């Protein structure tokens, strides 16, 4: 249940509008279609629809249609009788039967083959199905909630998705905004995930993010949305370790080699200015930038930063005071 709460954090108007729409839809015993990119929390919205409905005491069953081939998907959704195919040694109740009295959530619906789509339509219209290898219709009472990021109307035009099924599923459509359109929620969730990770790895507290880290989090596009944000924050907190200084290094790509701590970008430190100039002012600015760079590469450990500049701790502290850093 913790992850359910994690992904439903948010104050952005677009997200609050979704929650309000879900609250209105939940009591209605109608199919719902959820549209959203990967990592936006489609299953969690489906779960919310279930637990705010009169079916909340019934089962909430989910299935990713993209995870199975046509035959396995058919069997997993509708069940099969013993001997229906090679290896079917006993009767297997499908997801619809297991969701009887509750809600069935089908993710990646657009990947379902036409044969399965036809059977889904029959369940929606008549509330009945037949197991694979069976001949007796079974009555089921299930609310169907489906999700995809595909353009289903375009697929209908291409002939790869049934128009009548889309008509029945789209009683109402919930469109989840991507994280990049919820900028005000990024830091809210990042801080929450960071605190949770600190608890998981037994750290006493989370020291917060530096301004540079905040800019990194806010400027990134987040193609993986909330799921990616959670992974990135947890990874960064773990790598940050037990330092009491604010987290500065946001590790978005774990495969990218980190530069040595003592590496200094030549382009940033050795480029010569154009003349004429105020030499003292230039020296002051260079000194300040080197202090900031040493703090960054020393993970905001002032003793380590002083060592990087060949200074004593007290000399380094005096320079920080001089430049009001």
Curated annotation (Swiss-Prot):
A Gene Ontology term for the protein's cellular component: transcription regulator complex
Regulation (activators, inhibitors): ATPase activity is inhibited by interaction with PspA. Under inducing conditions, the interaction is disrupted, allowing activation of psp transcription.
Subunit details: Forms a complex with PspA, which is composed of around 6 PspF subunits and 6 PspA subunits.
GO-annotated molecular function: ATP binding; ATP hydrolysis activity; cis-regulatory region sequence-specific DNA binding; DNA binding; DNA-binding transcription activator activity; identical protein binding; sequence-specific DNA binding
SUPFAM superfamilies: Homeodomain-like, P-loop containing nucleoside triphosphate hydrolases
Keyword set includes Nucleotide-binding: yes
Record localization: Cytoplasm
Residues that hold ATP according to the record: 36-43, 99-108
Name of the protein: Psp operon transcriptional activator
PANTHER family: PSP OPERON TRANSCRIPTIONAL ACTIVATOR, TRANSCRIPTIONAL REGULATORY PROTEIN
Function in brief: Transcriptional activator for the phage shock protein (psp) operon (pspABCDE) and pspG gene.
Gene: pspF
Xref: CDD domains: AAA (cd00009)
InterPro entries, per database record: AAA+_ATPase, Homeodomain-like_sf, HTH_Fis, P-loop_NTPase, Sigma_54_int, Sigma_54_int_dom_ATP-bd_2, Sigma_54_int_dom_CS, Transcription_activator_PspF
UniProt entry keywords in alphabetical sequence: Activator, ATP-binding, Cytoplasm, DNA-binding, Nucleotide-binding, Transcription, Transcription regulation, Two-component regulatory system
DNA-binding residues (ranges): 302-321
Gene3D superfamilies listed in its UniProt record: 1.10.8.60, Homeodomain-like, P-loop containing nucleotide triphosphate hydrolases
Residue intervals of the Sigma-54 factor interaction domain: 15-237
Main location: cytoplasm
Organism from which the protein derives: Escherichia coli (strain K12)
PROSITE patterns from the UniProt entry: SIGMA54_INTERACT_2 (PS00676), SIGMA54_INTERACT_3 (PS00688), SIGMA54_INTERACT_4 (PS50045)
Gene Ontology biological-process entries: negative regulation of DNA-templated transcription; phosphorelay signal transduction system; positive regulation of DNA-templated transcription; regulation of cellular response to stress; regulation of DNA-templated transcription
